Regions:
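Histidine-rich, glycine-flanked metal-binding segment
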Residues: 1-4, 10-62, 77, 506
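Divalent metal-coordination and catalytic microenvironments
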Residues: 8, 28, 56, 67, ...
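Acidic, glycine-enriched loop/beta-strand segments at the rims
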Residues: 11-22, 407-413, 418-419, 460-469, ...
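Divalent metal-dependent hydrolysis catalytic cores, especially in the metallo-beta-lactamase
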Residues: 83-102, 106-129, 158-173, 200-213, ...
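Active-site neighborhoods of metal-dependent hydrolases
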Residues: 139-143, 151-184, 190-211, 256-259, ...
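Structured alpha-helical segments in the cores of large, soluble enzyme domains
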Residues: 189-202, 218-231, 247-260
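C-terminal cap of metal-dependent C-N hydrolases
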Residues: 334, 421-427, 432-433, 448, ...
Length: 549
């Protein structure tokens, strides 16, 4: 055997009681678990094996981030401590219906501009990513060999990654960016693309139903695509049509749609936001309980913070986004069109802003792609507008034009009681929704998992520690259909994290969002240390995790 983790408090990912044990690792897998209660001598030190004294530390499966935006970060940054230092050993990317495969050349260029605020990688970016893939299989292969020959210990990526087929990208490549129903031939073409992507290893399909162009798909189109996903045993992960005024209706739509399709459902960042939803999480959970009791297969993820994070352009009404990024900029430059957008945003409530009239004092600029605009970062749109002596919409419009739709934002619209109620639920998992771009990203990107463990489990007692760990490990592994991950069990892959239950905490704050966590001294992927004594090693043990893997 290669490694002995001695005298650890094992929290195995099932939600059951923890226990003290020696855990051995050999050839990248857990080879033995000797519980203290078993009696007899402790596990001897084998010749050549390393022994880590884990007394006082909890040993858990590596954490699974069910909602990540590291699609390019994994290719750009071999260190990727934003996730590795949290104990994350697997991320699910391809989220919110927009990512970089499957694509043709034209669609790739459009998608790069559309989500530069999430991931960087805009059309003019020179950040070391060469975009030399077009299919999902080619993208996953690229992850597997991202840093070969670059002098690291391993040539893959920092942590493992699973991929969802992005429905909006599929629609962009087949239908375009127009607001119209797909023809029968177009629907068939989209079904083929989704099927091919699942055959190449995608674990399911995502949608962004407040983002262009995925938002233009009707229920019939989405149901047809979900039937394809169901045939392959995948799941549908929608960012649904409203988290505000129409939130419950939007959740009902997703439950009904996947029920008709016979498809498993995973609700992305399942929140109830804005003033209209304060204290309404129990209504959502009652809806889900009824569906679960009737036999539906549903899970969800959340992050343990009240503010949200997205792009400023996502706030616009859907008609303003028709035609894609170039058409959006044309409308913003046209005074009459811009005034129509302002009226819907401020006085009616745009679907992009979840049907709620926008409150500019809750919209904080967290990042821009143009350094000349950096003075706006960390200020609300209302504050920037006041400094310039202009109306908030004037400031927002100018930022969108000058930064070519690039600004990212924090939305201060959540409610603590809703966050706590949803994280207690039996189908809850953890997902950071971590956007790594911008000068002041949301701290969830660097802090979600230690924040669950330190603040919500230990300090507030919202969840017992063993149950909290299950939400972050065993439960998401089951949703992904992973047979040998997510549990501390003999034969499982040694994707493991050792943390101090007494000190683990997120270091990231809204003021210093890139500060790394404390209390997580060791993280292993395939039995190899990616975090050792609290520091990132040069090990790149991560690979793509494909459907059925």
């Amino acid at each position: 055997m290669d490694l002995v983790l001695r005298d650890a408090r094992v929290i195995d990912g099932t939600g059951g009681a923890s226990y003290r044990a020696d855990v051995t690792v050999e050839a990248g897998r857990i080879s033995g678990i000797r519980r203290e209660s078993d009696g007899g001598p402790r596990t001897p030190r084998p010749t050549g094996a390393r022994v880590v004294d884990a007394a006082g530390l909890a040993l858990a499966p590596g954490f699974i981030d069910m909602h990540a935006h590291s699609d390019l970060a994994l290719l750009r940054d071999p260190d990727h401590s934003a996730k590795a230092a949290q104990g994350v050993t697997l991320e699910v990317i391809g989220q919110d219906g927009l990512s970089y495969a499957p694509v043709d050349d034209a669609t790739l260029a459009q998608v790069r501009q559309a989500i530069a605020g999430w991931n960087g990688g805009g059309p003019d970016a020179d950040d070391g990513v060469d975009f030399d893939w077009r299919t999902v299989g080619e993208y996953l292969d690229r992850l597997d060999h991202a840093f070969e020959g670059r002098g690291f210990d391993g040539g893959g990526i920092a942590v493992n990654a699973a991929y969802l087929v992005p429905q909006g990208t599929v629609r962009a490549g087949v239908v375009g960016w127009d607001d119209r129903p797909a023809t029968e031939a177009e629907r068939a073409a989209m079904e083929r693309l989704v099927a091919e992507s699942l055959e190449q290893g995608a674990v399911g399909m995502s949608s962004g139903l407040t983002y262009t162009p995925g938002m233009y798909a009707d229920d019939a189109e989405l149901t047809a695509l979900c039937r394809v996903v169901a045939r392959y045993g995948g799941y549908y992960c929608p960012h649904h049509r409203s988290y505000g005024a129409g939130a419950l209706r939007a959740y009902e739509e997703m439950v009904a749609l996947t029920g008709r399709a016979g498809c498993a459902l995973h609700l992305a960042h399942a929140t109830m936001n804005f003033g209209v939803n304060k204290g309404k999480a129990p209504e959502l959970l009652a809806l889900l309980d009824r569906a679960l009791d009737a036999g539906a297969d549903i899970t969800l993820d959340t992050y343990p913070y009240t503010p949200g994070c997205t792009t400023l352009v996502a706030m616009l009404p859907s008609w303003a986004s028709e035609g894609g990024p170039g058409a959006i900029l044309e409308r913003l430059r046209d005074d009459a069109s811009a005034e129509r957008i302002r009226y819907v945003l401020e006085e009616v409530g745009a679907d992009g802003c979840h049907g709620v009239p926008i409150e500019w004092d809750t919209i904080e600029i967290s990042g821009v792609t143009d350094p000349a605009l950096a003075g706006h970062v960390g200020r609300t749109v209302a504050e920037s507008a006041a400094s310039a002596g202009e109306a908030p919409w004037t400031t927002a419009r100018r930022l969108l034009i000058e930064d070519r739709l690039g600004p990212t934002i924090l939305q201060h619209v959540g409610h603590e009681e809703n966050v706590r109620a949803i994280m207690r639920h039996r189908i809850h998992t953890g997902g950071s929704d971590g956007i790594l771009q911008g000068a002041k990203p949301h701290p969830r990107a660097y802090g979600t998992f230690p924040h669950y463990l330190g603040r919500y489990a230990r300090d507030l007692g919202v969840l017992p520690l063993e149950e909290c760990v299950a939400h972050l490990t065993g439960r998401p592994a089951a949703r992904l259909g992973l047979r040998d991950r997510g549990l501390v069990r003999v034969g499982h892959r040694a994707d493991l994290v050792l943390f101090d239950p007494d000190t683990v905490a997120a270091g990231s704050t809204f003021e210093a969002p890139r500060t790394l966590p404390v209390g997580i001294p060791y993280v292993l992927i395939d039995g190899r240390f990616v975090i050792e004594d609290g520091r990132r090693t040069d090990v790149l043990a991560g690979r793509s995790v494909r459907r059925g893997g």
